[in-house]
Amino acid sequence: MKANNSFSLTIPSKSNNEAFARAAVAAFVTQLDPTIEEINDVKTAVSEAVTNCIVHAYRDTIGKIYITAQLFADNTVCIRIRDAGCGIEDVKQAMEPLFTTGGGERAGLGFAVMQSFMDTIRVTSRVGKGTTVTLKKKISLRVKADA
């Protein structure tokens, strides 16, 4: 299916860019007229994915985070967040709740949070090459009231 609209954004993996990425994607998704809950779901999932890039993919270095979002005729949004960082050795294990490579401060809930807020999440990764997180959510069609 061909996207009706799309946008791309590339940002440095700095923690202060996480809020910008979240807001940019949320603003783009408003074209589908989401509920407050739906927009918050998208913002939370994007925040978790971008934070994973900052904390895990590049660790103590600065790299690029590539974000694309697409809107489809069936009111679905597809968001891809990609890095060219260290990659994930075992994606299945990494997606288990409480698994973390980030040390004591990290809760290991990022992927679980993304899964709880989005309809589908797909993670592909190659060690030494990077990771792509694909998030999809169908935004409910709302009946417009006559003015």
Predicted segments, located by residue:
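Conserved beta-strand-loop-beta-strand hairpin that lines the nucleotide-binding pocket
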Residues: M1-S8, C53-A147
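Conserved short strand/loop->alpha-helix "switch" segment adjacent to the catalytic nucleotide/phosphoryl-transfer site
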Residues: R22-S47, R106
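STAS-typified acidic loop motif
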Residues: S8-A19
